[in-house]
Amino acid sequence: MKIALGCDHGGYELKQFVMKTLENLGYEYENFGCYSTESCDYPDFGAAAARAVAEGKCDRGIVICTTGIGISIAANKIKGIRCAHCADCLEAEMTRRHNDANMMAIGAGFTGKNMAERMVEVFLTTEFEGGRHERRVNKMMALEQE
């Protein structure tokens, strides 16, 4: 499984930690930036990571900014993306089980390294349940055609 990563300056340090976490867990990743703590714009990097997932170049994505909110909104503007802002492991698990989220957004200003590490592992190992949830996901995805 290959993971797309993106962040802004507020998420840079946590993204560096997430890259090490992915390496330790044996996942391949592609880093779509940013590449320093210099001020930058989260839509650029959230969208780049989301495009890689939407185009099938990466299987899932993790994006990070200070709150996780802005970068998740940017990622969700890309057709085919279901990016969930997650603050804990239960949210990371349930968004995979019930929403088949293909991206997760993390708020670096509110999420410590230990929590982020556990969230990444849960997000990447939890399977979609399908069933009634598949019907709901299909309805969400149909909204993109409106």
Language model segments and positions:
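Short, solvent-exposed amphipathic alpha-helices that sit
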Residues: 13-24
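C-terminal binding/interaction regions
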Residues: 2-6, 10-11, 89-146
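Mid-chain, well-packed structural core segment of small domains
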Residues: 63-64, 69-109
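A short beta-strand-loop structural module common to alpha/beta enzyme folds
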Residues: 28-39
